[in-house]
Curated annotation (Swiss-Prot):
This is p-hydroxybenzoic acid efflux pump subunit AaeA. Forms an efflux pump with AaeB. Keywords: Cell inner membrane, Cell membrane, Membrane, Transmembrane, Transmembrane helix, Transport. InterPro entries: CusB-like_dom_1, CusB_D23, MFP_Efflux_Pump, PHBA_efflux_pump_AaeA, RND_pump_MFP. It comes from the Bacteria. NCBIfam families: PRK10559.1 (NF007850), RND_mfp (TIGR01730). The keyword Membrane applies. The chain crosses the membrane at residues 12-32. It is found in: Cell inner membrane. It is a single-pass membrane protein.
């Protein structure tokens, strides 16, 4: 009897342990596959591609790569003497046409005052037409002067905002063309996190929900708020052929890969360039409130850390 009881006890204990293990594995699987988190997240920032609006030789480069600059700080300067001469020429044209317009205005006024009693209507009309032509030339010269002045101002390339100069690839003595990107400026205090969440996890992602961001290789946890969720992503399995007909890729019905949707997360505190734009992180959406880490069990903390390893 005792032997039978002992066997039943062992069987019952084994069965209970198996059931508990199954429940633990099932909960871990659900937690891993359905909870709103992703390792596919990246720090991003607003980046300005700085390109000159004039062409010429670069005479001075006032910054170095990865330097923190202030708004309106001079980055580099393009050949100013050429544009100064162009402005001087334009100003000389304006001065010439101003004098000429004054002469033609006096002549037209005199003829209009004398009237047809002293000269023909044709001569009066001719004087008025000449005045209008000169005034048109004066306006054109003034526009050319204003453009030359603008070009001269734009030979000095300034930072459009506070930020970090990166990928600086211009040097004094080089010729740069109009519109060619010379340097990128990563705006200060513009960093955010772009998390690519699987579509199966979007149920737990809403604008305003709180988020935890763990940079790769760091134990520090940053806080943030879901700012927005992308309204659509590209359908990679559907394209059009040369005649505009739909081309659909073949898929296995029993294998469905979840699409990833961009989710923009606003950081509570800007971290400068401690984690540069493009570096990766793990993001966990905790819901309407921040997670109280002090209340987490050992297994929950372990699950959070396992996310770092996939």
């Amino acid at each position: 009897m005792k032997t039978l009881t002992r066997k039943l006890s062992r069987t019952a204990i084994t069965l209970v342990l198996v059931i508990l293990a199954f429940i633990a594995i099932f909960r871990a699987w659900v937690y891993y596959t359905e909870s709103p988190w992703t390792r596919d997240a990246r720090f991003s920032a607003d980046v300005v591609a700085i390109a000159p609006d004039v062409a010429g030789l670069i005479t001075h480069v006032n910054v170095h790569d990865n330097q923190l600059v202030k708004k309106d700080q001079v980055l580099f300067t393009i050949d100013q003497p050429r544009y100064q001469k162009a402005l001087a020429e334009a100003e000389a044209d304006v001065a010439y046409y101003q004098v000429l317009a004054q002469e033609k205005r006096q002549e037209a006024s005199r003829r209009n005052r004398l009237g047809v009693q002293a000269m023909s209507r044709e001569e009066i009309d001719q004087a008025n037409n000449v005045l209008q032509t000169v005034l048109h030339q004066l306006a054109k010269a003034q526009a050319t002067r204003d453009l030359a002045k603008l070009d001269l101002e734009r030979t000095v390339i300034r930072a459009p905002a506070d930020g970090w100069v990166t990928n600086l690839n211009v040097y004094a003595g080089e010729f740069i063309t109009r519109g060619s990107t010379a340097v990128a400026l990563v705006k200060k205090n513009s960093f955010y996190v772009q998390a690519y969440m699987e579509e199966t996890k979007l149920e737990g992602v809403r604008p305003g929900y709180r988020a935890e961001i763990t940079p790769l290789g760091s134990n520090r946890v940053l806080k943030g708020t879901v700012d927005s969720v992308a309204a659509g992503v590209t359908n990679a399995s559907s394209t059009s052929d040369a005649k505009g007909m739909a081309t659909i890729d073949s898929n296995l019905e029993w294998v469905r890969l979840a699409q990833r949707v961009p989710v923009r997360i606003r950081l509570d505190e800007q971290q400068g360039n401690l984690w540069p734009a493009g570096t990766t992180a793990t993001v966990v959406i905790t819901g309407k409130q921040d997670r109280d880490a002090s209340q987490d069990s050992f297994f929950r903390k372990l699950a959070h850390r396992l996310r770092e390893f996939g």
